[in-house]
Amino acid sequence: MLTQIINGKILTPQGWLKDGSVLISDNKILEVTNCDLAVVGATLIDAKGMYIVPGGVEIHVHGGGGRDFMEGTEEAFRAAVAAHMQHGTTSIFPTLSSSTIPMIREAAATTEKLMAEKDSPVLGLHLEGHYFNMKMAGGQLPENIKNPDPEEYIPLLEETHCIKRWDAAPELPGAMQFGKYVTSKGVLASVGHTQAEYEDIQTAYEAGYTHATHFYNAMPGFHKRREYKYEGTVESIYLIDDMTVEVVADGIHVPPTILRLVYKIKGVERTCLITDALACAASDSQTAFDPRVIIEDGVCKLADRSALAGSITTMDRLIRTMVQKAEIPLEDAVRMASETPARIMGVYDRKGSLQRGKDADIQILDKDLNVRAVWAMGKLVEGTNKLF
């Protein structure tokens, strides 16, 4: 089956292509060309002058559509994934916050089942914790937080192959051994919920930690002790040129001015956008899965208002925030939501850009950057056909 999308501004790795077309054959991109002549036998989609861009690659998300990945069930996973696909996400790494090993095993079993399905948007499991600094726990469950334990993580990574990312605080005892081990298994090691200083971050990077979890959140910046000033985790990460970062670009977790600063220092190639969304995202629900969490001012907070606890945002809102509030070019905002996370997670060979031979993960955005249509693996996502 052939589908041809014409009459739109197409974002390619080389820049914008005007008046061209994207030809889809089953689940792959057959061609991206500057010719928009109709192909015989193809179903024609008129983009009506809108933006044709890659689908979003979400690497840090806890739930959506009223369901949380911590539930561990197939029903919850499918509902949350479907909710985010309505907003332009076409690839997703479900995230668990600090959990018990039985909870991780249940979620891993569900993840593996979904990954095995043909054309699945689920690409792997992300573990946010539970090896964190208790002082920087934020919305994490404190009773689950502990130091890295090889008697836990080695058997877990031996028995399952769906875990693609695992976050930890590098200053903890055993964190360097943990980083070296998980990266030896092809798992992305990320620093998060940490008070690490420059020496910690430098050593962590050398041990395999190449990424930073929700940059600026749950980590200190520049600070004073008595009369002296010290760099924080934030500045330390800036100083490691090749370290990648992710930002919750809802304009609340990180203000637009700081989003622009991250963009200017780390650049498109080392900055990706994440929702860090909870169950209430992409839904009418005003109740979080975690009873400790309230929704107020358009964000999730701990009930005592001591910390933010996640977002209610979606991928399309991240792009709008970066463009409309942080004043970043649309092409760069889209790349940070697609190409960069795909590179970070090692799936850029098939995801993250509109190129011949890649998976047909495509979204169409109107002039206000609202989602008007989404294709995941060449199939139109139900409920997104707002062009027709």
For the regions a language model picked out, list residue spans one by one.
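C-terminal cap of metal-dependent C-N hydrolases
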Residues: 8, 288, 343, 353-388
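Active-site gating loops and adjacent loop-to-helix segments of metal-dependent hydrolytic enzymes
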Residues: 82-93, 134-160, 203-244, 284-308, ...
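Conserved, mostly hydrophobic/aromatic
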Residues: 127, 182, 212, 322, ...
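Active-site core of metal-dependent hydrolases
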Residues: 158-283
